[in-house]
Amino acid sequence: MLYTDDVLNGIIDTAASSESFRDQCQAEIDALYTDNEQSVLWQCMENKPDLIQEDLSRIIRNNLNTSPPAALFRGISKKTMEYLEDLRYVGAIIEFNRVMSFSRDWQVARNFASYSFYGTRNIFCINNAPYAYNYQEAIFKMICGAPPEEFNGAYPEATRKSNLHLVNDEDEFMFPAGTTLRVDLIETHPLNNLYTVWHLTVLN
């Protein structure tokens, strides 16, 4: 979680009522990203289609944060579990050809890995990553800076509010395509034996 509920609600109210606040947020985004790059980042609110993978990976590499959280988590999908079938050992090297999203919040990863979503009950944990892209920070500011007409529906500020809550809760960080990882440990979670945790180190 980026902000507490009280702070988040204050930001939401300011974004809805203050054009100067929105302009300031947008100016900060414009200083970092082109219009095309902003369009790519907006699309990631829903998913990360093949069409934007190359551009998204480039954006990530150009805007890496070298002080990410000490631990980042990701619920493992069924498709990824198939890929990992022959990599269930310490020292195995994992490389993905797509952008990968992680969260600083264990609960977010657990929810994705649970039976209500992926159903694998397996979770990646990257420890002490040398870098990551703070997508949450970027898209949060973009949503704050967007004019009301950017949001669909009869109640644009309600859409802004729900989007900001979603982004705030997911705590999303990204790694570019081609990131190489090493398996350091595969263990049952010590506080929840229903889940298996893959501890990983970023190699490149």
Where are these regions (language model features)?
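Mono-ADP-ribosyltransferase
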Residues: M1-N204
